[in-house]
Amino acid sequence: MCRSSNLEKYVFYDLETTGMSPAFDQPLQFAAIVTDLELNEIERVDIRCQLSPHILPAPQALAVTGVRPSQLQNNNLLSAFEFSQKIQIFTEKWAPAIWTGYNSIAFDEAMLRQMFYQNLQPNIFATQFHNNTRLDVMKMVFAVHAEEPHILKWPINAKGKVNFKLDQLAPENGFRAHNAHDALGDVEATIFIVDKIKKQCPDLYQKLFDARDKERNLQLLKSFTPVEVTLRFGGSSPKTYTGCYCGLSKNSKNMVGFFDLEKPDPMELIHGTQQDVLDAMTKSPQRIRSLRLNQAETIRPASISNPEWRHTCDVIKDDTAFQTVVSECLADKYPQTEDTDSVVEEKIFDGFYSNHDKTLLVQFQISSWQERLTLLNDAQDNRIQQLGHRLIAFNAMHLLDPKYIARAQEFIVEKWTASETEANWNTIASVQRQLAELEASGFDNILLDEMKTFY
């Protein structure tokens, strides 16, 4: 059953950031509008923060958002640490809620998660836990395009393909007040699109709304009845696939096998070898797809069915050996490996913190910087110690001994001067390349000169 009540509400949100990497960029703006389920506004917030000392913003990102270098150095803004604290409090205030954005699962949520992690917030997964659910409106739009394309107008790009970007889709459908690439403007545009889907196609809207809850989705899949999901790969058009649950990865409770019911000869695969199953996952055409329950996919009951599909589902349900093979093949396809050379930003999923460290992080929020430095000596997880000393270097450097100060300064120099081919973050070399590309494209000279002076 879906979790729903009269108190349930949406939190529509968006971020503007220094670049595209959740691990190595940062949010500069967080905007959100809380509504009831009828999309009546309850509250809105619009928060900005300073640039962290170790981050070089991508010139191309500044060009898109229109953020001026002077805004990045505004000392009246919150620090990144204070910014993350304020957003964490906001998530707690409105839980449980339906956290909703446009392409939010792939981008905004990952950015939020990293921001909480790197700024030592107690609840890294704040939008996913505490009975929160999630919707990604871009995925809803994909389902509309595949199932009910007449209810929206579709902007076409230079290649003759549909442009699903919000800054194109919203104006094409009548949203005239869109301040594109401003977080609050994008939130308003997202609500506009949801409202249009809700009014124009209430049946499909309800199915997509019900898919917000991953526990409900797992129950639906494990009913071994035909279900459908709309997916988009690369630049292709979204397509709805009809299939059946066929196993849960032995390595991840969030990954399931999805058996394509529209492909021929299902029994041949069900009674085949383990290699046949692995081939069905890895070779084209795919007969078994992997779905991630924590990615807000648009899983819903199949709109049509037939006796053959239902029979295939029944066979899979009874064939636990086949489900076991699928479970093992999913684990083989997506092995869990530990990268011992990864930097701390990339270790966000290296296990949950102990209860001791969780309690420490709660205390960290209400302590002075001097007290925070002392608390770090008690942390069991090396990630907390490393990120914590970085925070103190950025926010209260006077508390550190010369050894740590020198190390912090060396860290920034090494980060900025790293080889562009080896770094996953913005470096001086990548910044200079992007500035040259903007200049060659005829970008606004005034803003470009400001950028050059800033860098």
Where are these regions (language model features)?
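Metal-dependent phosphoesterase core characteristic of DEDDh/y 3'-5' exonuclease domains
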Residues: 24-30, 34-65, 91-202, 208-211, ...
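General structural signal for secondary-structure boundaries
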Residues: 68, 78-80, 165, 206, ...
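Conserved RNase H-like, two-metal-ion catalytic cores of nucleic-acid enzymes
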Residues: 2-79, 249-254, 263-284
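Generic detection of long, well-ordered alpha-helical segments
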Residues: 77, 81, 106, 184-187, ...
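Acidic two-metal-ion nuclease catalytic site recognized across multiple nuclease folds
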Residues: 2, 196-321, 414-455
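Conserved DEDDh/DEDDy metal-dependent 3′-5′ exonuclease domain
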Residues: 64-148, 303-306, 311-362
